[in-house]
């Protein structure tokens, strides 16, 4: 995730043939697939296979599109609820929040990754790419947003 934010991508939601941004632009979901790719997982292939195997789990997708489905927060929220460990959204116990955990915010509008850095209360910093700030950052943002999903990918 840090390698992705180090490229200083600009925030822009855009459709890509093949699915992967290649022009220095990106969105919050790119942090997630990039981090999983660095760990040896092909999130795009996993999401595409799950949509094909269980389309009813993804009612927001009327026609699957492998070029974009894995880059939508609501799709990733559904995928991680089905295939990752679902954890607490309560921030009161910082030890429940570990580096690499995936966090969804609001009405499935934003997603990021927990850092190994923590604030004074023990809550991890968030590695994410946000709009309208147009920044890919690692900072103390989790407490400022409404957490609606918290997942741990176990592979």
Say what each PLM segment does.
Residues 1-81:
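N-terminal capping segments
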Residues 4-13, 19, 110-113, 133-134, ...:
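Proteins with a high burden of low-complexity, intrinsically disordered sequence enriched in S/T/G/P/A and R
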Residues 52-132:
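...with weaker cross-activation on analogous glycine-rich loops/strands in unrelated enzymes
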Residues 122-134, 138-155:
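Low-complexity, Gly/Ser/Thr/Pro-rich intrinsically disordered linker/tail segments
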